[in-house]
Every structure is written in structure tokens, then in C-alpha cells.
């Protein structure tokens, strides 16, 4: 795209605090945005071909609340991204990310994290440091097991659909705020589903279709009645 078009977008963003440039075939993060590090609240560069974020610029957007780079070619995230102390929404669906920076737990304001369609091989332990995290989407990755650290996750909703999960720590029942757990289309045997999820957790929507067991058998598990009480109570609340 031409420089004049980009300049026009930058000028608009200066007034609105929102920079949106989708579907433009961009191969790199626009360096012109460094003029706006103290204005921008929202950046959306989805549906481009960006393969990296510039470490020297990305951490300087001190007011940024929402960053979207869905459908790009990112393979790694720089540590400097984690300087964004006001960031509430981070959407990086359909990239090529295998892991998150070790400093990711410093994104202390983060509420919504979308990483669907990446190449994560494990549940990132850094997520357990994020105290305000509400919604986490890790669907369509390559996660094989959910470790004990999951018990410290603060999220209300966790989407793990379409992974390769065959092991699930019993500690998932200890998540203090977890209400919605999506595990559809994984590799779980019925014996690998901790009974405490049903009988002794906060979870009121558990989606497990498309695993290695029949739903009929799932409904026969001890504790299923208790789970259904929570499910029905929640349904009534929102009816």
C-alpha cells in the first residue's frame, strides 16, 4: 500500500487512538506507529503477513488496551511485548507460535487471550500468573497434557477444543473461577477425566464431545448429577 494511505491511517489514529489496517498484505509492523506510542489504545493488524514484532517499538505503547494480529505469520513474541501493563485483550489466532515469552506473566491487566490455531505444545505456565485473566482460547493447538500448575489458573473460561490432550490433571478442579471448560475433539479416555471436575469444582459447562468415549457413558459417571445441578442453575440464571 502507498505511503500516503498509510499516513492517512496514522493521522486518523492520532485523533481516535485506534489503528486498524487489515487485509493489506503487510509483511512488517508499520514503523510509522512509533510516533503514536503514547496515543494508541487499539491496534488491529489482522489478516496480513507480518512475521515478527519489533522489540524496540512494541513495548512502548503504554496505553494500549487491545492488540490483534490474527492470521499473520508470527513465530515468536518479543519479551518487550510484556511491558504493556494496560493490555486487556491480546488476539493472535492463526499464527505459528510454539511458546510464549517467559515474561508473559507480567501482562498484569490481561483479561482475554486468544491463541487458537497456533503450534503450542503445552499449556503455558505463565498464564497462571495472570490474576485478571477471564477468557483463554487455546483451541486448535498441539497440547497433549494439562499439568498440575493449571490449578492456579484464574480464568473463567478455558477453550482447549481440537488439541491432542490425553492427560488432564485432577488440579483442574481447583481452578477458583473456572466455569466453562471446553475439551471437544481431543484424545481423552473416560478414565482420564477427573471425577472431581463433576463432583467438586466450579465448572458449570463442560464440553467433551468428540473424545475416545461415548457421551452416554460420561453421563453415567459418579458426580454427573452434581454437575447437572450447577449446569441447570446457571442456565436458569441466564434464561
UniProtKB/Swiss-Prot annotation:
SMART domains: LRR_BAC (SM00364), LRR_TYP (SM00369)
PROSITE patterns per UniProt: LRR (PS51450)
Sites of N-myristoyl glycine lipidation: 2
Keyword NADP: no
Keyword Lyase: no
Keyword terms, alphabetized: Leucine-rich repeat, Lipoprotein, Membrane, Myristate, Repeat
Major subcellular site: membrane
Subcellular location: Membrane
Protein name from the UniProt record: Leucine-rich repeat-containing protein 57
Coiled-coil region(s): none
GO cellular component, one term: membrane
LRR repeat feature ranges: 39-60, 63-85, 86-107, 109-130, 132-153, 154-175, 177-197, 202-222
